[in-house]
Amino acid sequence: LNGTVVRAQLLSGEESMVCGSTVAAAGYVSVEVSTNGLDFTSDGAQYESVWSVVSGVAPRSGPVTGGTVVTLTGTGLVASGARCRFGASSPVAASVDSASEARCVSPPSGATGWAALELLSFDESVGGGSFLYDERVWVSAVVPLLGPVEGGTRLTVLGSHFKETTTLACRFGRGSGASVAARYIDSSEVECATPVQSGVSARSVEVSVNGQQYTSFGVAYTYVASAAVSWVWPVRGPAEGGAPLTVHGSGFTASSEALGYLQCRLNGTVVRAQLLSGEESMV
């Protein structure tokens, strides 16, 4: 390679492979071959030596179960022989989309914590960073269990192993369900505002810490028709309270009553309500 001689390993009767390039500078070099150690060809084959630099890793974390699609960004990334190595795990295939971006999928890990992440080219490290293996996130319950299709309900999601990240999110429905940013409360609780839903239906609520991989526990949140008040009877009553007030309207449901959600608010005072029919409730 230019003036540097290295040993080659025979692959077949027609081709050989250099065991390792010792080119110390970026640029094109002339590659020639000798079969007797003295006389070299003069065919002028070219090899481009590039400096590969990895400057970014995203996302920086994923579950110990693996499966995170990790994007490495940098300069001079080469597709030939590209693989990724996470810690002491065996290297996995890498896809180099351009000289500035490569992708690989994290393998499972037997332990949580930081692991060195290396981008390899023919088993030689050309740069990398670090990747954090997290505990698997769990979702166990949501409060409340239902809300209006217009969205905007402040939903509390309970579970375990939540982390405060900029990518923390809730998803309503599997696959292409709507995702919204979540607010971290603690490792067992996050909050998110329910998105708008086109119709009455149940949606599983899942959580992602890295913005890519969501839980799959199927805890349901039910979208219901919004309640509306048409009129009340009587329109006047004693100031000391205690008189029954019938509220007429729509969207009052037995499930809301059974869950203890059916309530009336009189100015700032909230009281439980009893359902009379699908169109009216009574304090």
Identify the function of each model-found stretch:
Residues 38-81, 123-164, 212-257, 271-272, ...:
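Beta-strand/beta-sandwich contexts
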Residues 1-4, 77-91, 162-178, 252-271:
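Short, surface-exposed alpha-helix to beta-strand junction/turn motifs within ectodomains of secreted
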Residues 22-28, 107-113, 196-201:
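Surface-exposed, short loops/turns at beta-strand junctions within beta-sandwich domains
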Residues 1-18, 267-281:
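Thr-biased low-complexity repeat/linker tracts and other Thr-enriched repetitive architectures
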Residues 10-13, 94-99, 182-187, 275-278:
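RNA-recognition motif
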Residues 16-22, 101-107, 189-195, 282-283:
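Exposed aromatic-hydrophobic patches
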Residues 28-30, 69, 114-116, 154, ...:
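Short, conserved beta-strand segments of beta-strand-rich sandwich/propeller modules, principally
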